[in-house]
UniProtKB/Swiss-Prot annotation:
PROSITE patterns: CULLIN_1, CULLIN_2. Residues 845-905 form the Cullin neddylation domain. GO terms for cellular component: Cul4-RING E3 ubiquitin ligase complex; Cul4A-RING E3 ubiquitin ligase complex; Cul4B-RING E3 ubiquitin ligase complex; cytosol; extracellular exosome; nucleoplasm; nucleus. Gene3D superfamilies: Cullin Repeats, Cullin, Chain C, Domain 2, Winged helix-like DNA-binding domain superfamily/Winged helix DNA-binding domain. This is Cullin-4B. The modification Phosphothreonine is found at T49, T148. The gene is CUL4B. It is found in: Cytoplasm; Nucleus. Pathway: Protein modification; protein ubiquitination. InterPro entries: Cullin, Cullin_CS, Cullin_homology, Cullin_homology_sf, Cullin_N, Cullin_neddylation_domain, Cullin_repeat-like_dom_sf, WH-like_DNA-bd_sf. There is a cross-link at K190 (Glycyl lysine isopeptide (Lys-Gly) (interchain with G-Cter in ubiquitin)). Residues 1-100 are annotated as: Disordered. PANTHER family: CULLIN (PTHR11932). Its main location: cytoplasm.
Length: 913
């Protein structure tokens, strides 16, 4: 330990003592030392120098305009005296360290208040005007071992007018003494003037005492061996540090470094024998090697702290030499871990622990973390461990993947894969080096997923989709997204599933009644899966649309027809299944399905027919809903598609205005009876084509028809009216035993019922002759009146079907809870004739469109080959056409002289103007 005292003018002695705190100690400046008086270091006599002012005492602030640029410099400048303890250099940041030494320093100021400051061992301390490079020069200012020499040198400095406020002689146990100086500013310097620091080197450098080098090295060697053997060091660490500095100052650094390396190498070599025992268990061996490594690191940190001056001067200036810490790593790597037997046993033990953990056993993870950190510090992690680790991982998961794919169902297997990936990610965080991350995760993904992509999908995708296993599907997509090409394989299977499942809905005629609803449900299902499971991936959305378009058109025309009927069922009056808002959403969903069908003209034909019924019979649930659907169709298909449908609505509006005028006209006519006539004027080009049917109307009805005809043609001359009896409907008043009822019936039902005002019983043939109704239509009419829910007629004999010999009477005992009763007409399951007629009209319209397209193209191109003509026709048409049908239309146009075959090339056509 060193003590330092200085005399002052007031006769009191201020003492700076060093305290030991875990390492070695050194005098350190205090933050409050600026108030401490600067005194001259003499032989103990009171200085005759006048007391220095407070301004002059603050040496650092008065000597440089940049005094605040370094905290360390400020602290040192403000001390009352300076020790010969060397400035400490910062540690190499690249050297790992698990501990550090602190210097505990207390400086007694003039106020006698101890101020404690701790400096980290790595911190830089430097005197004003000195740095590490001046180590040798500053040593020349050291006095000999006697205090007299120090006093003599101080007198020399005074004679040379060097401004040095104090010089302290410090005597060391090793016989060397060294003084350091604190430089003050010029006392008489003017404010704002330039301030100079004058430092003059000492001329003489004292010689080392005899045997000093050997004795000093012996002390250092004993200290190093004590550290290596974990015994107490009998020398003060500060003394040892100073000894190293002294040796370095006298250019003995090279030999000192060599000796230090040798003693460290000898100690490490002696450790290898304990690891060559074959009887050691692998875990015990790992613990032993880890303990050896931890001890080595701790020892090298302490050794380096003693030889820090050597590390920061000589070693730093010689780039070919490793630092003391790196030297320790090299020696441990060369003599311990590079031993093939030790290395193999270490790597085998680490791999065994990892394998046990993967099998579910509990292991010492901190041991693994320490050992793998050791391999990384020794720079053999990748070459010695990582390659073998990845090979073992690949082997383990390859076997596991093959086994579990056969034993487990897909959901269980997917959860297992996810668990494995999470475990490996945790290992990377806990003890593996981050450089292993990419290779490790890629290996697991390849063996558990990449090798089984197709097998997983073929084995379980359909079940997951059928059962709507949202969580499992989400996990499936998440895992497949990690593997290169995984999403593409999933996408292909996704398309195949939609096509296969959708085809079962469309192709099977038995599902016609529920086809549209099933399509809507299926569409909702796949949309939900895409949104939740596939994260709205655009590729899956487009693939779904293509798949729907493919399977829904496998059965031409029928889906379009059924979609039209489904819309009719939703827009018809009496549909109380949904609110207006729900109905609007339903129509939006139907339009999505509608986009997929090719035969939109088929939809239009059936939709128009059903719309006509709703409008004429007043069955529309909502005019707003009807117009909303019309707007959606117009937006989807264009104005040309909906022009006729819009014309139907216009006809209904005009008919209302005409009937108001007709009622005013009727008030001036003397017409017997109380029949009220309502007529809808329909433009033939807008409405579906109806087959006219001549029936025998009662004279009263005929009379009213003639009156209306006279009225209408009087306003619109040149027009022709054609009565459509199939669309007529009436309200009859009837009296039964239970009371009066109103019957809402068709015109044909009306004609049959009115006959029973003239008689009580009629045969089928008699009714047919009297009404003139066509046989099939009459049978359906009688069936609705005598065999339906509201049986206002009785049939003899009883039965569900109408036979030739059947007779009918009025059912006077008819009962019903309602006053107005609607008796529905029995429809021929879309009457085969009516359906065929509608389809035929569609085909006829298509022929016209094909002919028009061919003529337009030929008129523009004049001459064209068959293949190019067919290609351009396909591009213009909005519905599918078979090549054979297209060829027939071309032949038809040739026959009608619209075009001709080229005489030289039969495969080429010429337009005929």
């Amino acid at each position: 330990m060193m003590s330092q005292s200085s005399g002052s003018g007031d006769g009191n002695d201020d003492e700076a003592t060093t305290s030991k705190d875990g390492g070695f100690s050194s005098p350190s400046p205090s933050a409050a030392a600026a108030a401490q008086e600067v005194r001259s270091a003499t032989d103990g006599n009171t200085s005759t120098t006048p007391p220095t002012s407070a301004k002059k005492r603050k040496l650092n602030s008065s000597s440089s305009s940049s005094s605040n640029s370094s905290n360390e410099r400020e602290d040192f400048d403000s001390t009352s005296s300076s020790s010969s303890t060397p400035p400490l250099q910062p540690r190499d940041s690249a050297s790992p360290s698990t501990s550090s030494f602190c210097l505990g320093v207390s400086v007694a100021a003039s106020s006698h208040v101890p101020i404690q400051k701790k400096l980290r061992f790595e911190d830089t301390l430097e005197f004003v005007g000195f740095d590490a490079k001046m180590a040798e020069e500053s040593s020349s200012s050291s006095s000999s071992s006697s205090p007299t020499a120090a006093t003599s040198q101080q007198q020399q400095l005074k004679n040379k007018s060097i401004l040095i406020s104090s010089v302290a002689s410090v005597h060391h146990a090793n016989g060397l003494a060294k003084s350091s100086t604190t430089v003050s500013s010029f006392a008489n310097s003017k404010p704002g003037s330039a301030k100079k620091l004058v430092i003059k080197n000492f001329k003489d450098k004292p010689k080392l005492p005899e045997n000093y080098t050997d004795e000093t090295w012996q002390k250092l060697k004993e200290a190093v061996e004590a550290i290596q053997n974990s015994t107490s060091i009998k020398y003060n660490l500060e003394e040892l540090y100073q000894a190293v500095e002294n040796l370095c100052s006298y250019k003995i650094s090279a030999n000192l470094y060599k000796q230090l390396r040798q003693i460290c190498e000898d100690h490490i070599k002696a450790q290898i024998h304990q690891f060559r025992e074959d009887s050691l268990d692998s875990v015990l061996f790992l613990k032993k090697i880890d303990r050896c490594w931890q001890n080595h690191c701790r020892q090298m940190i302490m050794i380096r702290s003693i030889f820090l001056f050597l590390d920061r001067t000589y070693v730093l200036q010689n780039s070919m030499l490793p630092s003391i810490w790196d030297m320790g790593l090299e020696l441990f790597r060369a003599h311990i871990i590079s031993d093939q037997k030790v290395q193999n046993k270490t790597i085998d033990g680490i791999l065994l622990l990892i394998e046990r953990e993967r099998n579910g056993e509990a292991i010492d993870r901190s041991l693994l973390r320490s050992l793998l950190s050791m391999l990384s510090d020794l720079q053999i992690y990748q070459d010695s461990f990582e390659q073998r680790f990845l090979e073992e991982t690949n082997r383990l998961y390859a076997a596991e993947g093959q086994k579990l794919m056969q034993e487990r169902e897909v959901p269980e297997y997917l959860h297992h894969v996810n668990k494995r990936l999470e475990e490996e990610a945790d290992r990377l965080i806990t003890y593996l080096d981050q450089t292993t991350q990419k290779s490790l995760i890629a290996t697991v993904e390849k063996q558990l997923l990449g090798e089984h992509l197709t097998a997983i999908l073929q084995k379980g995708l359909n079940n997951l989709l059928d059962e709507n296993r949202i969580q499992d599907l989400s996990l499936l997509y998440q895992l497949f997204s990690r593997v290169r090409g995984g999403v593409q394989v999933l996408l292909q299977q996704w398309i195949e599933y939609i096509k296969a499942f959708g085809s079962t809905i469309v192709i099977n005629p038995e599902k016609d009644k529920t086809m549209v609803q099933e399509l809507l449900d299926f569409k909702d299902k796949v949309d939900h899966i895409i949104d939740i499971c596939f994260l709205k991936n655009e590729k899956f959305i487009n693939a779904m649309k293509e798949a729907f378009e493919t399977f829904i058109n496998k059965r031409p025309n029928k889906p379009a027809e059924l979609i039209a009927k489904y819309v009719d069922s939703k827009l018809r009056a009496g549909n109380k299944e949904a609110t207006d808002e729900e109905l609007e959403k339903m129509l939006d969903k139907i339009m999505i399905i509608f986009r997929f069908i090719y035969g939109k003209d088929v939809f239009e034909a059936f939709y128009k027919k059903d719309l006509a019924k709703r409008l004429l019979v007043g069955k529309s649930a909502s005019v707003d809903a009807e117009k909303s659907m019309l707007s959606k169709l117009k937006h989807e298909c264009g104005a040309a598609f909906t022009s006729k449908l819009e014309g139907m609505f216009k006809d209904m509006e005009l008919s209302k205005d005409i009937m108001i005028q007709f009622k005013q006209y009727m008030q001036n006519q003397n017409v017997p009876g109380n029949i009220e006539l309502t007529v809808n004027i329909l433009t033939m080009g807008y409405w579906p084509t109806y087959v006219p049917m001549e029936v025998h109307l009662p004279p009263e009805m005929v009379k009213l028809q003639e009156i209306f005809k006279t009225f209408y043609l009087g306003k619109h001359s040149g027009r022709k009216l054609q009565w459509q009896s199939t669309l007529g409907h009436c309200v009859l008043k009837a009296e039964f035993k239970e009371g009066k009822k109103e019957l809402q019936v068709s015109l044909f039902q009306t004609l049959v019922l009115l006959m029973f005002n003239e008689g009580e019983e009629f045969s089928l043939e008699e009714i047919k002759q009297a009404t003139g109704i066509e046989d099939g239509e009459l049978r359906r009419t009688l069936q609705s009146l005598a065999c339906g829910k509201a049986r206002v007629l009785a049939k003899n004999p009883k039965g569900k079907d109408i036979e030739d010999g059947d007779k009918f009477i009025c059912n006077d005992d008819f009962k019903h809870k309602l006053f107005r009763i609607k008796i529905n007409q029995i429809q021929m399951k879309e009457t085969v004739e009516e359906q065929a007629s509608t389809t035929e009209r569609v085909f006829q319209d298509r022929q016209y469109q094909i002919d028009a397209a061919i003529v337009r193209i030929m008129k523009m191109r004049k001459t064209l080959s068959h293949n190019l003509l067919v290609s351009e026709v396909y591009n213009q048409l909005k519905f599918p056409v078979k090549p054979a049908d297209l060829k027939k239309r071309i032949e038809s146009l040739i026959d009608r002289d619209y075009m001709e075959r080229d005489k030289e090339n039969p495969n080429q056509y010429n337009y005929i103007a």
